[in-house]
């Protein structure tokens, strides 16, 4: 639970839409814990949090979490998601206004949805600063549609740009996202967002008893055989087919006495998030099975405990694996194949480097900032490969890594990865970056435009107070 630990501590509140177990939620939890470790008092406000489906730091009450507005629906007939997300966030902030909690904080950190920022600016203390963490512009994450969908989205996109721009400080998760920010929000060209990279838990590099047991299970299952690894959700945008096609061409380059000997041939393991209720997950796994068979690769799927694998298997699918198995697979893999293109950041390559496994990724998006491409003259710092997402190039890189690199070089790449994670992607580094950006927040009211000035007029404030009072009393 959050506690005030010193005279120099600040009161910091996060405003987040849905505190589940996604990547954005992992960042919020890590940032909150990190800022708490820096002797600040931290609270997370959210519209939804299921204590049975959240991160341990939340379920254990290490962090203070308060929920407002969970009774609102998230959609109607699977439509109007953005509208209801705004309504839920709007209600949350109105609750903070009515209860007076909004006046308690030195800083607010808002992420994903920026629509509440004007209210926070108007009703928080004059010296309070608002930081917005832009994982990616929401309008680019929305599913594309026809004219009516574009017409429906237009006001939300305009409001997103305006509300984002009136925050006191804006940060993004990578330099790549920073470039997308400038291309998307053309009206904010004078704003230069900071960059705060997501982090990984350095403590997870230390094996627990469960990890040791899982390592034994994995080693017994593969019986010393080598394997390449892909870890992604089973979604088409993750381009997992690239790993399968590259593996097929890599296998074709091996001598037949290796590629056809079931005792020593390398395999490809495709693991990741899978929900049988999500149609795309189910369809995509079927498509990947079909692709494997079309390339004359024998595939096998295991759900649950690793018990037995047919000796002839080339590709092993492991949908919906638990964290300890994911960790063990990464540690024991020859090379991690990270197939998505134009990822905003991409935490999986960083996790792989934490466990000293080199990475092969597409040469675009966020992974260009985490992976140091290996060339003949940078063995002191290289952590893997960044290549065009082309199966010919990838298969050649896999072949070079598998057949030409000695163990000392592979170990050095792994050690370099761990060093880079400690230098750039630790929770301490991230929380320090958040604190510095909060301290440097310096936007002034006169820089926020005429509309913001009108919003701050006392009549508008009174109207919002009355609305908040009515809604809170109505649904309390």
Swiss-Prot record:
<comment type="function">
    <text>Mannosylates Man(2)GlcNAc(2)-dolichol diphosphate and Man(1)GlcNAc(2)-dolichol diphosphate to form Man(3)GlcNAc(2)-dolichol diphosphate.</text>
</comment>
<dbReference type="GO" id="GO:0005789">
    <property type="term" value="C:endoplasmic reticulum membrane"/>
</dbReference>
<keyword id="KW-1133">Transmembrane helix</keyword>
<keyword id="KW-0812">Transmembrane</keyword>
<dbReference type="Pfam" id="PF13439">
    <property type="entry name" value="Glyco_transf_4"/>
</dbReference>
<keyword id="KW-0472">Membrane</keyword>
<feature type="transmembrane region" description="Helical">
    <location>
        <begin position="449"/>
        <end position="469"/>
    </location>
</feature>
<feature type="glycosylation site" description="N-linked (GlcNAc...) asparagine">
    <location>
        <position position="7"/>
    </location>
</feature>
<dbReference type="GO" id="GO:0006488">
    <property type="term" value="P:dolichol-linked oligosaccharide biosynthetic process"/>
</dbReference>
<comment type="pathway">
    <text>Protein modification; protein glycosylation.</text>
</comment>
<keyword id="KW-0325">Glycoprotein</keyword>
<protein>
    <recommendedName>
        <fullName>Alpha-1,3/1,6-mannosyltransferase ALG2</fullName>
        <ecNumber>2.4.1.132</ecNumber>
        <ecNumber>2.4.1.257</ecNumber>
    </recommendedName>
</protein>
<dbReference type="GO" id="GO:0102704">
    <property type="term" value="F:GDP-Man:Man2GlcNAc2-PP-dolichol alpha-1,6-mannosyltransferase activity"/>
</dbReference>
<feature type="glycosylation site" description="N-linked (GlcNAc...) asparagine">
    <location>
        <position position="257"/>
    </location>
</feature>
<feature type="transmembrane region" description="Helical">
    <location>
        <begin position="80"/>
        <end position="100"/>
    </location>
</feature>
<dbReference type="InterPro" id="IPR028098">
    <property type="entry name" value="Glyco_trans_4-like_N"/>
</dbReference>
<keyword id="KW-0808">Transferase</keyword>
<dbReference type="GO" id="GO:0004378">
    <property type="term" value="F:GDP-Man:Man1GlcNAc2-PP-Dol alpha-1,3-mannosyltransferase activity"/>
</dbReference>
<dbReference type="InterPro" id="IPR027054">
    <property type="entry name" value="ALG2"/>
</dbReference>
<dbReference type="InterPro" id="IPR001296">
    <property type="entry name" value="Glyco_trans_1"/>
</dbReference>
<dbReference type="Pfam" id="PF00534">
    <property type="entry name" value="Glycos_transf_1"/>
</dbReference>
<keyword id="KW-0256">Endoplasmic reticulum</keyword>
<comment type="similarity">
    <text>Belongs to the glycosyltransferase group 1 family.</text>
</comment>
<keyword id="KW-0328">Glycosyltransferase</keyword>
């Amino acid at each position: 639970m959050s506690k005030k630990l010193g005279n120099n501590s600040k009161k910091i509140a996060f405003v987040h839409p849905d505190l589940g177990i996604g990547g954005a939620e992992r960042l919020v939890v890590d940032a909150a814990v990190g800022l708490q470790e820096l002797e600040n008092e931290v609270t997370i406000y959210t519209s939804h949090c299921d204590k049975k489906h959240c991160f341990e730091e939340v379920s254990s009450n290490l962090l203070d979490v308060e929920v407002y507005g969970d009774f609102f629906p998230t959609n109607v007939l699977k439509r109007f998601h953005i509208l209801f997300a705004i309504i839920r966030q709007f209600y949350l902030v109105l609750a903070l206004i009515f209860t007076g909690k909004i006046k308690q904080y030195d800083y607010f950190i808002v992420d994903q949805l920026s629509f509440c920022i004007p209210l926070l600016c108007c009703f928080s203390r004059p010296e309070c600063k608002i930081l917005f963490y832009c994982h990616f512009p929401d309008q680019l994450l929305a599913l594309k549609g026809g004219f009516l969908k574009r017409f429906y989205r237009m006001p939300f996109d305009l409001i997103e740009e305006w509300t984002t721009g009136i925050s006191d400080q804006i940060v993004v998760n990578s330099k790549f996202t920073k470039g997308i920010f400038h291309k998307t929000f053309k009206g904010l060209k004078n704003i230069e967002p900071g960059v705060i990279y997501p982090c990984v838990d350095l403590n997870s590099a230390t094996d627990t008893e469960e990890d040791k047991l899982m390592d034994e299970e994995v080693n017994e299952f593969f019986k010393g055989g080598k394997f390449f690894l892909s870890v992604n959700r089973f979604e088409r945008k993750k381009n997992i087919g690239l790993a399968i096609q590259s593996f097929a061409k890599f296998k074709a380059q091996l001598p037949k006495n290796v590629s056809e000997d079931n005792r020593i041939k390398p395999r490809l393991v495709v693991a990741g998030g899978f929900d049988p209720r999500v149609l795309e997950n189910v369809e995509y796994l079927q498509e990947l099975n079909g692709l494997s068979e079309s390339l004359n690769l024998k595939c096998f799927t295991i759900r649950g405990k690793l018990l037995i694998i047919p000796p002839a298997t080339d590709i092993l699918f492991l949908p919906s694996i638990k964290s300890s198995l994911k960790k063990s697979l990464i540690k024991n893999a020859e090379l991690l194949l990270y197939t998505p293109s134009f990822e905003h950041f991409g935490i999986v390559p960083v996790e792989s480097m934490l466990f000293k496994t080199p990475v092969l990724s597409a040469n675009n998006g966020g992974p260009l900032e985490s992976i140091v491409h290996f060339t003949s003259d940078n063995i002191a710092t290289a952590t893997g490969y960044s290549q065009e997402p082309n199966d010919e190039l990838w298969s050649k890189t896999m072949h070079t890594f598998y057949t030409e690199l000695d163990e000392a070089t592979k170990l050095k790449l792994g050690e370099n990865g761990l060093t880079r994670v400690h230098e750039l992607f630790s929770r301490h580094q991230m929380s320090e970056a958040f604190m510095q950006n909060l301290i440097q927040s310096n936007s002034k009211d006169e820089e926020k435009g005429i509309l913001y000035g009108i919003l701050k007029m006392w009549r508008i404030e009174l109207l919002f107070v009355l609305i908040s009072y009515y809604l809170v009393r109505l649904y309390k």
